[in-house]
Amino acid sequence: MSAPTTTKASASSSPPALRPLSSSLLLTIPTTNAQLVLPSVTVPAARRHNSTKSTNSTTSTNSTTATSKMPIERRAAEIEKRIAAIPLERYRNFCIVAHIDHGKSTLSDRLLEHTGTIVAGDGNKQVLDKLDVERERGITVKAQTCTMIYKHKEDGLDYLLHLVDTPGHVDFRAEVTRSYSSCSGALLLVDASQGVQAQTVANFYLAFAQGLSLVPVVNKIDMASADVPRVLEQLETVFELDTSTAVKVSAKTGQGVGEILPAVIKKMPAPVGDAKKPLRMLLVDSWYDTFKGVVLLVRLFDGTLKQGDKVYSYATGNEYIVGEVGIQYPDAVPQKVLRAGQVGYVFFNPGMKRIQDAKLGDTFTNVGYEDIVEPCPGFEEPKPMVFVAAFPTNQDDYGRLADSISHLVLNDRSVTLQKDYSEALGAGWRLGFLGSLHCSVFQDRLRQEHGASIIITEPAVPTKIVWSTGQEEIVTNPAEFPDPDDHRIRSATLYEPFVNATVTLPEEYVGRCIEICENARGVQKSLEFFTATQVILKYELPAASLVDDLFGKLKGATKGYATLDYEDAGWRQAQLVKLNLLVNKKAVDAVARIVHTSQVERLGRQWVTKFKEHVDRQMFEVIIQAAAGRRIVARETIKPFRKDVLAKLHASDITRRRKLLEKQKAGRKRLRAVGNVIIDQSAFQKFLSK
């Protein structure tokens, strides 16, 4: 591979094959607590954390304060006036990519302050992260965009910058991939204390495959554990990047941040486009607004877009009239026109009512030019990798919970939804997610934004069945997996999804991590030392191992130093069986799982032991079993309450004693045959919790 320097990668380069991903979490964009200002009056806005001062942290002459009180219309007009004076060659569209928790959102805050887009202050934390769950967890779930106007300190000219803050977790890589379509360059951010990690590697190759210009940035240089020379060596060794121009910053204190934007302007190309040509507009993202309908985030390659224009959708064939256009600054600011090279928002009048009509990767053009303008390459729809069933804790809350789930799914097209029913838990839904964290975030959002309490079953991966006739079937619900009595399953071939996993870790933990991967039925592909003490392990692993807390086991074995990244590797033939939990020989359908035959006995013993702890004693004996097909692999028994039927008898009446005991035994047997085991919903909640 001929790795890129900080200039644009050539088309002849041959990056590794990557799985294309696409749309991911979508959401409405509420107002942030950041103060929106105009870049007009100049004041210093350097960060002053802990009295840290640096000549590098001096801000651009764009910073402002008093204009925050300016009326919205005048504020928008001032911004539009400055943008109109900036030619296309002074546009720069770029994103920040890095491993999770390397400081992307904090650096975004400093850049917004440095350009005067928001007023500098200690309250600016994760300004572009709109969700409560993002702020609580300290992660970015949804890629966020912002337009900035920057006055270059060398030539004194205005530059129009479009920034995308991308997620770092592997579950949301589709957000990163889609963000690249609106960018011509990327800041490759690396933590000075952690160094290159798994998703740093993955994001580099994604950017390399897209031909983006890369600017390496080393963050957190103010930390006591920072080792900048080691990180620069890793960037040179692993990526063959020229680190002589790497920018060293502390996003927390603002040190060195002033050097980033000049590097962006110098090393990243301007977007290519022509405002005089017919409209050619790519749909990058969308979200639903109660009053406006579907709002589109778009990138204009050619032409202009303004209120009243009639546009045509290549994906649906529908025509729309533009109601409003604008930019994110960082909140929505209406504009009269969007030009080629810009990224902004648009909604229609009458509004687009169905989020399904906004197909990510769709191309729009002016009505009448649909046969002339060539559509942009689209995105591949993301494939859910993890499926769960969700049920209300109280069936009386079904309607309210249905509305809450529908509202979230409306703004998160990567979630698949269908109705489900369980004899044990009642009516519910079957949900598909991009990964375990995606599922967890969805559940947190449901509880925070709608106050919903739900029971969510253990995550499961899909299974492919190839029948003897050659017909294929994908099973996402274990309850729908054929019973062993079905003669067709005996001649069918079963497949499970696999992933190509990349694990980075310190050298001293290699042995333990290899053992964990081998126990997870992994196949080692390579082991590389990218520094004297850091190792990259590449394994082919079943996707089921990822939902079985493989990452948690790796983190535990390496004292938190291991990092994991993965991508789809297709289907592999496997020996699979459905594991059922039986209560008095009756299957609890909501708990069923499809597992590999090597895991049946271990998982079965765990099930019966844990479930016994949460089931109350009954008036009759309760037998809890784990069954793989027709074979019982584990059993626990809950003894019944015992009534002392001998209390009124004399000790010498042995015949009467025996008769009463036999009668009690027969009664219990009859009760067990006709009685229903009463299992409280809280028992399922506790059993299904980690």
UniProtKB/Swiss-Prot annotation:
Enzyme Commission code(s) on record: 3.6.5.-
Instruction: Please give the InterPro entries that the UniProt record associates with this protein.
Output: EF-4, EFG_III/V, EFG_V-like, EFTu-like_2, G_TR_CS, LepA_C_sf, LepA_CTD, LepA_IV
Q: Where is the composition biased (Low complexity)?
A: 52-68
Q: Which positions make up the signal peptide?
A: none
Give the UniProt keywords, A-Z: GTP-binding, Hydrolase, Membrane, Mitochondrion, Mitochondrion inner membrane, Nucleotide-binding, Protein biosynthesis
- Tell me which Gene3D superfamilies the record gives: 3.30.70.240, Elongation factor 4, C-terminal domain, Elongation Factor G (Translational Gtpase), domain 3, P-loop containing nucleotide triphosphate hydrolases, Translation factors
User: For this protein, what reaction is catalysed?
Assistant: GTP + H2O = GDP + phosphate + H(+)
Region (Disordered) residue spans: 40-68
Its GO CC terms? mitochondrial inner membrane; mitochondrial matrix
Subcellular localization, as worded in the UniProt entry? Mitochondrion inner membrane
User: What are the residue boundaries of the tr-type G domain, all occurrences included?
Assistant: 89-272
Q: What is the protein's major site of localization?
A: mitochondrion
How does the record say this protein sits in the membrane?
A: Peripheral membrane protein
Task: List the Pfam families.
Answer: EFG_C, GTP_EFTU, GTP_EFTU_D2, LepA_C
Report disulfide bridges, numbered on this chain.
Answer: none
Q: Give one GO term, molecular function aspect.
A: GTPase activity
Where GTP binds, per the record, is at: 98-105, 165-169, 219-222
Q: Report any one BP term from Gene Ontology.
A: positive regulation of translation
CDD domains the record matches:
EF4_II, EF4_III, LepA, lepA_C
Q: What else is known?
A: This protein may be expected to contain an N-terminal transit peptide but none has been predicted.
Family designation:
Belongs to the TRAFAC class translation factor GTPase superfamily. Classic translation factor GTPase family. LepA subfamily.
Protein task: Promotes mitochondrial protein synthesis. May act as a fidelity factor of the translation reaction, by catalyzing a one-codon backward translocation of tRNAs on improperly translocated ribosomes. Binds to mitochondrial ribosomes in a GTP-dependent manner.
Return the protein name.
Translation factor GUF1, mitochondrial
Native organism: Sordaria macrospora (strain ATCC MYA-333 / DSM 997 / K(L3346) / K-hell)
